[in-house]
Amino acid sequence: MAASIESSTFGALAPQQFDRAVIALTSCLPNNWLGLRLAILLRRLVTVRLAYPDGALDVMRWGLRLRLHPRDNGCEKNLLFTPQMYETTELAELTAEIARANRRRAGFVFVDIGANVGLFSFFVAACAGPSARILAVEPEKGNLERFFFNMRANPGLPIRVVSAALAGEAGMLAVEPDLRDRGGTRVHQSMHGGEVTVEAKILLQLLTQEGMESVDALKIDVEGMEDSILSPFFRDAPQRLWPRFILIEDARTVWDTDLFSLLAEKGYSVASRSRQNVMLRSQRSLALESC
């Protein structure tokens, strides 16, 4: 089980010679359709030999020690085998935002909503350095165990992890893990008494409790609940808390609110898009920087 794996120290699950060779090969493939097809075929030679669901390997990524579980989490699998293809548009935009904060001589403030096992938070910590402030929010226990293991393997990172869900109103929500792909974990209103529940917080309430004065970048991926979290935030939050940059999963087909129109009204414009995500930048903050 995951608990026994995470109880071992980093390095105990280092890839053996064959696994290292496959990972080295898949990590060098071109970031195109053919490269991805080859990587999918080759990585099966490794994953089929790992225990299901929580088999893991210890590797270095972004200069950090990370234990990655490729059998039941797509983001961990992708970073393990194809780091050169991993969220390239998203990470490039975050790197640009970190550079902007550096030019302002300000520590980078990042809020990671629906953090999964924390890969975006770890990337920002590696790139922005110890002056950063990272707040990661994740409701699912198994994801949190993996997150905390990698935190322990990299002591001193400027990441605070909050075990909670975010929602449009405070209360308790049921957690529904997706055991085939942990990135698909959902939260919803409890239907009966036997469910695992977690505290639901309001985004503005959380930022206030954490003493946040501003936010440079906010990433939100919560399986269709993005509108219920951000709509009340932009209704009630002071402008100083509006993020300079937002990375959001495009789930408009299930939203109750036209969130992209709302963000446009608040002065955000689309900076770039990827297959699943949209990245928006505050034109107000850019105008202030140019003054």
Regions found by a protein language model. Name each.
Residues 1-291:
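Phosphate/nucleotide-binding beta-alpha loop and adjacent structural elements of enzyme active sites
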